[in-house]
UniProtKB/Swiss-Prot annotation:
<feature type="active site" description="Proton donor">
    <location>
        <position position="64"/>
    </location>
</feature>
<dbReference type="InterPro" id="IPR011060">
    <property type="entry name" value="RibuloseP-bd_barrel"/>
</dbReference>
<protein>
    <recommendedName>
        <fullName>Orotidine 5'-phosphate decarboxylase</fullName>
        <ecNumber>4.1.1.23</ecNumber>
    </recommendedName>
</protein>
<feature type="binding site">
    <location>
        <begin position="62"/>
        <end position="71"/>
    </location>
    <ligand>
        <name>substrate</name>
    </ligand>
</feature>
<feature type="binding site">
    <location>
        <position position="9"/>
    </location>
    <ligand>
        <name>substrate</name>
    </ligand>
</feature>
<keyword id="KW-0665">Pyrimidine biosynthesis</keyword>
<dbReference type="InterPro" id="IPR047596">
    <property type="entry name" value="OMPdecase_bac"/>
</dbReference>
<dbReference type="InterPro" id="IPR013785">
    <property type="entry name" value="Aldolase_TIM"/>
</dbReference>
<feature type="binding site">
    <location>
        <position position="117"/>
    </location>
    <ligand>
        <name>substrate</name>
    </ligand>
</feature>
<dbReference type="GO" id="GO:0006207">
    <property type="term" value="P:'de novo' pyrimidine nucleobase biosynthetic process"/>
</dbReference>
<feature type="binding site">
    <location>
        <position position="209"/>
    </location>
    <ligand>
        <name>substrate</name>
    </ligand>
</feature>
<dbReference type="Pfam" id="PF00215">
    <property type="entry name" value="OMPdecase"/>
</dbReference>
<comment type="function">
    <text>Catalyzes the decarboxylation of orotidine 5'-monophosphate (OMP) to uridine 5'-monophosphate (UMP).</text>
</comment>
<comment type="pathway">
    <text>Pyrimidine metabolism; UMP biosynthesis via de novo pathway; UMP from orotate: step 2/2.</text>
</comment>
<feature type="binding site">
    <location>
        <position position="179"/>
    </location>
    <ligand>
        <name>substrate</name>
    </ligand>
</feature>
<comment type="similarity">
    <text>Belongs to the OMP decarboxylase family. Type 1 subfamily.</text>
</comment>
<feature type="binding site">
    <location>
        <position position="34"/>
    </location>
    <ligand>
        <name>substrate</name>
    </ligand>
</feature>
Length: 231
């Protein structure tokens, strides 16, 4: 089963209204609630605590940590103490940073960020990387994460099938950049529909603005679930 993760990159009051509406309609479906810098800077760790207290959903604190290993380790420890279910670290931070994150995760799951979906092949040129394409660079980063203990990776839907075929260990594949209407790309360059992402092997499908900017978030989630064959 592929799960929908709702990216709540909106003010806190709006986020709570959306979650309440979704809960009223999808009480038994295991949604994941993702909060990022916007809400975290507004509410701090209380955002995680309140969501966990008021709703039966897993909470994903997406801060994309990237710093020296000791700093990331301390941050991960504090994030875990909030009751967070998932958090992210940038795999570009390297093996030692990843190991320190994993060592301090407690019962939380660590997700390694590969290449953001706002990047395309031009990013490889910008980095002056020896990799010929973004797909193989993503595979390299994913292996760095999985070999050092992450529970899953965040990658584009264009790479998820390639990763699943070329990495022997089981891992959670989290795919952002999902659009029900692919023409609504916003600042994403590599996008798929929910059905396409599931077919290619995504375990968690992240949908943000199509839900949070909709007048009817419930309809958007319901439509995505139908496209995925989950209801």
């Amino acid at each position: 089963m592929a799960r929908i993760c709702v990216a709540l990159d909106v003010p806190w009051e709006r986020a709570i209204k959306i979650v309440k509406d979704l809960y009223d309609f999808f009480e038994t479906y295991p949604l994941i609630l993702k909060i990022g810098h916007k809400i975290y800077l507004e509410k701090g760790g209380d955002a995680v605590k309140e969501l966990k207290e008021d709703f039966p959903y897993e909470v994903f604190l997406d801060l994309k940590l990237h710093d020296i290993p000791s700093v990331v380790g301390l941050a991960v420890e504090k994030i875990s103490e909030l009751g967070t279910d998932y958090t992210t670290v940038h795999l570009l931070g390297g093996p030692e940073m990843v190991k320190e994150a994993v060592k301090n995760k407690g019962s939380m799951k660590i997700l390694g960020v590969t290449i953001l979906t706002s990047h395309d092949e031009n990013y490889i040129k910008f980095l002056k990387s020896n990799f010929e394409d973004i797909k193989n660079f993503t595979l390299y980063l994913a292996r760095v994460g999985i070999e050092n203990g992450v529970d899953g990776v965040v990658c584009s839907g264009e790479e998820v099938e390639f990763l699943k075929k070329n990495i022997e260990k089981d891992f959670i594949a989290v795919v952002p950049g999902i659009r029900i209407k692919k023409e609504k790309r916003h600042d994403q360059k590599r996008v798929l529909t929910p059905a396409e992402a599931k077919k290619r092997g995504a375990d968690v499908i992240v949908i943000g603005r199509e839900i949070t900017e909709s007048k009817n978030p419930v309809y958007v989630v319901e439509r995505a679930l139908k496209m995925m064959g989950e209801i």
